[in-house]
Amino acid sequence: GKQISGPEGLFYATKEGLEAKGAKIHMETEVEKIDFENKKVYATGKNGEKYEESYDKLILSTGSLPIDLNIPGKELENVQFVKLYQNAEEVIKKLENKDIKDIVVVGAGYIGVELAEAFQRIGKNVELIDLADSCLSGYYDKEFRDLMNKNLADNGINLNYGEKVLEIKGNGKVEEVVTDKKSYKADMVILAVGFVPNTKLGKENLELFKN
């Protein structure tokens, strides 16, 4: 909602700032293999350049990945995840298109609620959908959630709880979101149904908790 000047405002550190402190940074680089026995990390950059780094101590902070909804139509244009810096940049750029008026946000957790509020502030028609019976379900008690729901509704956000998204429809671009109760016009859809730990890297050598 223009509370920050751009997507860079979402981050507390920059590449330049970290380099100024002596860190070696490889952006847009995928770690493909970790040799735990010999303490080496192998990676490939976006341009195909190969990297090999040795370590004394290794910190795995691979974060999380968006939960992938297995529904038809998720590949349509303007169906967005918002997880990475690049995702935020893409959404902000697309919102410059005046034809994007109706936005459906799927998922009423922290990210879904914040995005719904931000879209409403810039004049978009917002539908917030969640399978639960309230926003922020599992985070707060009913009293606080009721206040939050009232605040969202009072600010013009349409709340659609207890609904399961079945399909996203469109011809190349998204046009409609279909749930088990009704359908919603959509020029953009934000999928914000949560995250799972990104444990793929090195999991064959590490003991993981079941949760």
Predicted regions and their residues:
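Short glycine/proline- and charge-enriched loop/turn segments
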Residues: 1-3, 73-75, 130
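Rossmann-like dinucleotide-binding cores of NAD(P)H-dependent redox enzymes
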Residues: 4-5, 10-11, 102-103, 110-167
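FAD-binding core/adjacent interface of flavoenzyme oxidoreductases
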Residues: 11-102, 176-185, 190-192, 197
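Short, structured coil segments at secondary-structure junctions
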Residues: 21, 74-75, 122, 155, ...
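Short glycine-/acidic-enriched loop or helix-start segments at secondary-structure transitions
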Residues: 36, 69-71, 115-116, 138, ...
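Short hydrophobic/aromatic-enriched beta-strand-loop microsegments
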Residues: 79-82, 126-130, 209-211
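Internal nucleotide-binding/catalytic subdomain
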Residues: 149-211
